[in-house]
Amino acid sequence: MIAKQRDRRRGRITAALVALSSLAALISGTQQAVAEVKHIEIADKGKIFKSEPASGFVLHPREIPGVDEGQTARSVIEGAEAKGVVTRVSPLSVAQSKQHIGRPLCHTTGINGTFKYNGFCWDETDDKTSAWSNGWHPQGFTASHDADASGTVDGHHLYMATWYYGVKGSDRNKKARISILESTGTERTYGHVLLVRPGGSRTDPQFTSVDDVHADGMVWYGNRLFVANGGELQIYDLNHLWKVNSISEKSGIVGGTSSAEYHQWALPMVARYSNRTKAQQDTAKPEKQSNMFCDGAIACLSALSLDRSTSPPRLVSGRYGDAEREAEVDVIRWPIEYLGEGGTSPVSATAAYKAPVHGLQGVATDGTYYYISAMCDTDYMKVAEPSDPAAYYCIWQAVPDGPVSILTRTPPLTQNLSYSFSSGRLWGMNETNGMRVVFSLLPRKADNSQYLYNDYSKLCSGVGSTVENSKPVIQWRCNGSEDELWVFEETKDNNGNPAYFIQNRYSGKCLGTGSSLANGKGMIQYTCNSKVDEKWWYDQDTHELRNVYSGKCLGLGSAATKGSQLIQWTCNGAQDERWIISRTAPKV
């Protein structure tokens, strides 16, 4: 949310972040003038993701402004369709319109290669557009894996993102759109849909673009689309996705003509909930009357995802917290079955947690772990200033009432997350203009990582907390650090015999010989590329690791000291060629 760059919620962002930093935020291809970032020390690793009482978090059913008394949003929508001024279409048809053509992954992500990440980019225009300069910023993310347990809708993999529009500076949150994209694996096509609010009556239907909106998060479930907006939850019905019959700057219906501010499609709201009653909102101070307002004392929906591990599923929301905040931020679970059209009773949360992280932007769960996009700890993988909007973000993980830990770095200002129960992949996207990507990864891929312990030196193999290609793989005192853990991924040699890629848990790089055949050649880490010099045979009886390319054994030579580089040598049965692979750190 450009570090939730919004003028709207006092305390939601610090002056240090509003003033930005040396952000490589491109606006129309030029670099934005920014100020120096204030140094803030962040050290959240090990803090507890703890349960808290949920009864105080409530969503109240609210009216949709502009609908005539005695009418409903549904009746207005049906009236517009009956007049023939709009045409109902499917999400798939929007995606397949090819209004925009996405690109393969085009920017550096910072994601650890261990987690087998992939993804795509928007087209160049949507990559660079900015809500700070007459354009758009992306926020929420959902997909067909949320909509249907099969992972597809009408047999297709579809993805959606919310965007909010701004004119310049603080004049943002003017309107919102969603993008509907289909990915076939080789082609990514999408279209933009304006979010609109119905008004008037069945006999005199009208609509206008939704304003006062940041569109923080989004969940697609069945035919319903839930859009989080800070202090508000908006609901849309995708069975009433409209194609308008004219393209102009106007929004609404005039005679027999419908238009949606230069959009081909519009999606009307059918219901809304708020963290306050109408009386509470109307009597609030002027600066707190926005639909987006939340201050932490009440439910704050700054992120939204779907948990399909329960039946029925649960909505999961998260509250944003800036770099300087001290208190934890709320992660709340909501009963989706009670949130819909025609609601007359408040809906209470079913569970809640305190997330001890800075800059929460997204949250999702696989039913066991919660995944949170937030600022990295200071100096994690050389992230010196986590509050710098140009800095990598991190995905954190935790089980309820357990400590938080970093899973991986992610692109700067990573926003909402979405977990696919059909594929086991965690999806996300970031908002930094000129650096935007949509990505997915396998978050549990490193769960079976193991220590590689030398029988001669009694030391563990590691990478010295480096992430760069060609850095030496060394031995060090076994201390349980992440860079001493290795993922042994099964593969085959050229003859179909079992072999392994050995991938470092910390760097995500593979252990290899640098395509060398020489005795004494030092082992290095390198981006895994499936080359034969990254493949290893392991003999369970002799405990030898033999490189498939060179045929040489992994060893130490005569070196038994901390920091010495691992080498390859003609296999000779020496003790320094014996390696113990263990799930637990050796005790020495």
Task: Give the ranges of each region predicted by the language model.
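Loop/turn-rich, solvent-exposed surfaces of beta-rich toroidal or solenoidal domains
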Residues: 146, 314-402
